[in-house]
């Protein structure tokens, strides 16, 4: 029995906790990595530069979600074949996905580079920060293939039950990004451009290290495989496409929401951008738990251990409840201090009000997001993608409709008031679908 097979041998609580904790810790470092640009730019350059970096966040998240969604399609099949010990098919999926999705990343990177100005103008980015935002975005797209490779390989590692290696790489990358940010922004005075270059270098080095380590790991599984298999690509896309649509649809929705925020001015955008970073910190905890559930479910489905799936789902819900409580207490006690990390002395009272109101509202309702992510994780692991996609579209529709209709008339607060309603609706739809499609031993065969 391989040591990587603990997801199908240890108790569900131990298996999921041991597997999820490095991913949760990694989520903090992921956000430290992401926030480094914002914090350092906000402190050493000013709130306008922070707004420029923040203005890119919704758009860059769309492309990140494409990478993550692509990884999900490959990861579910890798987990299932790994659980069934069909290592040749597993390696075929890995090779096919890397070839296909890296080509896609190059196409998207070229598109983003040449259309950066049009994209940011279309989001109604304030004129005083448009040039900096476009500059940051173009450098970001140059490094997009590295970002794509790193995210797909991280998914591959977790799919075979290895969550510590991505954590180590993420810690290294985060520290490198912070040091490069400090040198280029605070030391060399390169401003927004320096922050973007620092991120590009950190992403590139992390992607190369990830590839070399994963290649070494795959060589341990002695079996023949195809470098590219069209049929396996189709199987992968059946799972990846709904996941890409779900994740990118939500991010596109956030772009539209940002377009609603932008007319309120640079200070409103700075406050909104600050809290979006904080939201991402806590959101990634729940996302990590959901992402841990998916390979756990898929491996146990492949190993025909159906009884362990429900137990694992319950463990995930308990973890979500604990972290939602931590998020609530942290935000209630420290929301002003957290906002000041991003806004600094340059932030106005209005920016602090936007940031604080948004942050506290999220703190009350993060539990809804947690149970939604755990339920979505089970659906992904089982390959039940249609209700998963529908639930997330309903979530987005609620959030967008309230923001678009109410915020321009009644104030910026309506941008975030509907968020927990969308999370709860998403959970209820996903839960009903899961109850109707709960796996039996007949499902435990690989299609």
Predicted features along the sequence, with ranges:
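Short alpha-helical transmembrane segments in multi-pass integral membrane proteins
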Residues: 1-20, 78-143, 187-241, 297-364, ...
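N-terminal transmembrane alpha-helices
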Residues: 7-44, 58-73, 77, 102-109, ...
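Interfacial/gating helices of multi-pass transporter permease domains
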Residues: 18, 41-61, 127-132, 192-193, ...
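Transmembrane helical elements of multi-pass membrane transporters/channels
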Residues: 18-37, 139, 173, 202-206, ...
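Helix-terminus/linker motif at the lipid-water interface of multi-pass membrane proteins
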Residues: 28, 32-50, 120-127, 183-190, ...
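Small-residue-rich hydrophobic transmembrane alpha-helices
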Residues: 50-110, 147-166, 271-335, 369-383, ...
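Hydrophobic transmembrane alpha-helices of multi-pass small-molecule transporters
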Residues: 62-65, 177-181, 206-211, 281-284, ...
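Short runs within selected transmembrane alpha-helices of multi-pass transporters and secretion channels
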Residues: 71, 140-158, 166-174, 195-208, ...
